[in-house]
Amino acid sequence: MTHTQHRPDHQLRTDVTEELAWTPSVNAEEIGVSVTDGQATLSGYVGTYPEKEEALRAATRVHGVTVTADKIAVRHGHDVPGDADLTREAMLVFDRRSVVVPKDSVQVEVRDHVLTLRGAVPWQFQREAARNAVAGLPGISGVRNLISLRPSATAAPAEMQAKITAALTRHMPEQSRYVEVGVDGTQVTLTGDVPTAAERRSAEQTAWFAPGVTAVDNRMTLTD
């Protein structure tokens, strides 16, 4: 793969700032941006936790940004639920909504408006669904997802590697040849390089789809 010159940090800073302003779900006026060696840092304040996540995603979308560091704080209004109320609200979410996690598999704790999820589920998509189901609750400043994975199906490392490699070829036929898949037990390691952060995320998501995977170490780098 051909490597070209990296874009200067000052240009990336301008691009990230413009992308934040372009994102309708983000109030960019109170968000500061700095970039060092392609690594963007966002600081300042937002009104909700989902807005904070949207800001971080916006920065990651900018071509040339390799890492996005989070120094954004959530600034709540006056009528903020307490930790006990937030805990009850989070548990109600799992009781009353069609969240794709096994019943009674997730436990919730809230301290200083930071919500912690514990428990075990078979798939990564269920782990993510549990987190997404409560991340938008009013008054939440952050979510720690400590849910572990206990797959209901297993596969031999060679079989798992072959399935992931085949899926990568289907999803990204041109770039998949630059991606190396390693499997150690139930843990997958991705190495190599791709042009965009979106393709890097796509490769990781593909690895998570393989039955039996409990961890994905994404070491892929971006070419510019």
Language-model segments: residues:
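N-terminal targeting leaders
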Residues: 1-224
